[in-house]
Amino acid sequence: MATVSMRDMLKAGVHFGHQTRYWNPKMKPFIFGARNKVHIINLEKTVPMFNEALAELNKIASRKGKILFVGTKRAASEAVKDAANSCDQFFVNHRWLGGMLTNWKTVRQSIKRLKDLETQSQDGTFEKLTKKEALMRTRELEKLENSLGGIKDMGGLPDALFVIDADHEHIAIKEANNLGIPVFAIVDTNSDPDGVDFVIPGNDDAIRAVSLYLGAVAATVREGRSQDLASQAEESFVEAE
């Protein structure tokens, strides 16, 4: 199963927190000290906590669980999308729309509209419209694709959230808490760990650190899914005998 070592984390700068004046005292148990007015995260805590989170995500994936990757900061946006796509999971990487989980009924209607517009754009419907109407629908399609494209095939609520930056994505975390969906999150020294079921203390800004987290999670999810597929194949083989 995918695991991450202390050396990997040091190389990626996972241990660099935020400036000491921005700290959240609830993160004190995970802070090693400070250097040049920047908090240093204790990787002796982070390594086992991250590997425990990976083991749990692997389990969820092996039971056909759906994992929603959330990272709407510009620096993480593309990496979040790529990681989710690489393990056939789902993502929100632009703006978290309030009610995305707690008001799923309405979101489902918007997803239906997105899929209808996609069909229209491909079956020649747009070409039969006036230029103005076609432009309006194209813009609507782009807007919906931007906000819902990563969850349009999710088919219901996710079984877990993997979040880059607990502070930035606090609305998503709150919604997941309300619905009892487990939250796995990168929590930096300026963030509140409350509401996060699997806290991963670490740098949530450096792209190398973000890529390290996402790469490990995607790998463990792929592994979990392949276990699920292997057990399905075994079952059908037994039935055929």
From Swiss-Prot:
Source domain of life: Bacteria
GO cellular component: cytosolic small ribosomal subunit
Classification via InterPro entries: Ribosomal_uS2, Ribosomal_uS2_bac/mit/plastid, Ribosomal_uS2_CS, Ribosomal_uS2_flav_dom_sf
Gene Ontology MF terms in the entry: structural constituent of ribosome
Example GO BP: translation
Pfam families reported in the protein's UniProt record: Ribosomal_S2
Keywords: Ribonucleoprotein, Ribosomal protein
HAMAP family xrefs: Ribosomal_uS2_B (MF_00291_B)
Family of this protein: Belongs to the universal ribosomal protein uS2 family.
Cited NCBIfam families: rpsB_bact (TIGR01011)
Protein name: Small ribosomal subunit protein uS2
Lineage: Bacteria, Pseudomonadati, Pseudomonadota, Gammaproteobacteria, Enterobacterales
